[in-house]
């Protein structure tokens, strides 16, 4: 049983805010802090996710909750573990223009007295936990615990073109100890294999998907390179080094990287970011003339003995003729040392398999 969820690529939040003349003000009020997602969990009921890196494009798909079904657009996020959607209890402006779950309309809903709190780079979500049937593609997950938001402070969610988030990372980082959706799919024997795979299309193309329980052979014709996980928290792997052209620029003594579909850019430590933009000859804000793309060198990630190369066409984002690097600087170092986030800029170049049975990530080159 293999189940495909098509993903839509949303207009970037950066562009929507720019169109409304709100970008500068937004960035002042919400300084970008990607590190907040990956900081050690402060309390058992808190986990971090980078809502801000949904600044660029986001890929989202539809799920349904309840009986009869109520539909929601969610980001399938391999960098977090909770499922949550807005609820009718939410009076924040962000909830007013999104779909809201109404538990009184579902005959299968079971309430709890538990609360959930999730902090983001730009704000936080707090709410209550409940149980219901969650339909993902043709899979009905019974008794799935999920968050019903009561507050979504800040204007951030207001402009997002998705309603909630479905986390696909490990139970160990789930806020309030809530069992993640994929863990229930496995324990309820709803998938043929204990893995899922992700294809994210390039600019403007359709066809992105998450496939639960299988690998689509049409996307693995160039072979699959398997990388063992270094931790069962995020989908975390060890990188050997990073090169620009043939020059060794970062990750000198190996470093940790997280493969994160919920982060649109490629996030790296401050020192690495400074060295890379210097080597690329790009200004510190990452803006670049679109005419220069052809002159830029490849950036290569050496992982488990294999070179994974990003050409400039992959790491430079062109939005309506203005170009910027798809790299972001992590800012504060995490307790995990030098950490990288391989977001959508990286994932678009590979068909990625997230294998829970063997705790590995598989990467198959797409071009």
Swiss-Prot record:
The active site is at 77, 260. Disulfide bonds join 90-95, 251-255, 290-323. Residues 59-364 form the Peptidase A1 domain. Glycans are attached at residue 113. Its EC number is 3.4.23.1. Belongs to the peptidase A1 family. Shows particularly broad specificity; although bonds involving phenylalanine and leucine are preferred, many others are also cleaved to some extent. This is Pepsin A. The gene is PGA.
């Amino acid at each position: 049983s293999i189940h495909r969820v098509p993903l839509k690529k949303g207009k970037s939040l950066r562009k929507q805010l720019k169109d409304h003349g709100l970008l500068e003000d937004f960035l002042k009020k919400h300084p970008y802090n990607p590190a907040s997602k990956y900081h050690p969990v402060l309390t058992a009921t808190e986990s971090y996710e980078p809502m801000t890196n949904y600044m660029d494009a986001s890929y989202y798909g539809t799920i349904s909750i309840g009986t009869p079904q109520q539909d929601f657009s969610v980001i399938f996020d391999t960098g977090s573990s909770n499922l949550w959607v807005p609820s009718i209890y939410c009076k924040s402006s962000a909830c007013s223009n999104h779909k809201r779950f109404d538990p009184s309309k579902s005959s299968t809903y079971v309430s709890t007295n538990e609360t959930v709190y999730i902090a983001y780079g730009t704000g936080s979500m707090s709410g209550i936990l409940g149980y219901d049937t969650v339909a993902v593609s043709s899979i009905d997950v019974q008794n799935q615990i999920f968050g019903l938001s009561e507050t979504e402070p800040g204007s951030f969610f207001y402009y997002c073109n998705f309603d909630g988030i479905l986390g696909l990372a490990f139970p160990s980082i789930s806020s309030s100890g809530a069992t993640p959706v994929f863990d229930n799919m496995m324990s309820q024997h709803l998938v043929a294999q204990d893995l899922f795979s992700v294809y994210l299309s390039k600019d403007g193309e359709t066809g992105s998907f998450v496939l639960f329980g299988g690998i689509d052979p049409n996307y693995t014709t160039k072979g699959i390179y398997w990388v063992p996980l270094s931790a069962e928290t995020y989908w975390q792997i060890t990188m050997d080094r990073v090169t620009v052209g043939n020059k060794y620029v970062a990750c000198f003594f190996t470093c940790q990287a997280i493969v994160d579909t919920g982060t649109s850019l490629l996030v790296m430590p401050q020192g690495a970011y400074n060295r890379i933009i210097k080597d690329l000859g790009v200004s510190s804000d990452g803006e670049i003339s679109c005419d220069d793309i052809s002159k830029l060198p490849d950036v290569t990630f050496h992982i488990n003995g294999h070179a994974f190369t990003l050409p400039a066409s992959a790491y430079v984002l062109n939005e309506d003729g203005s170009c910027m690097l798809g790299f972001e600087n992590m800012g504060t170092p995490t307790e995990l040392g030098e950490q990288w986030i391989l977001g959508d800029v990286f994932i678009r170049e590979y068909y990625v398999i997230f294998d829970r049975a063997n705790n590995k990530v598989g990467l198959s080159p797409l071009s």
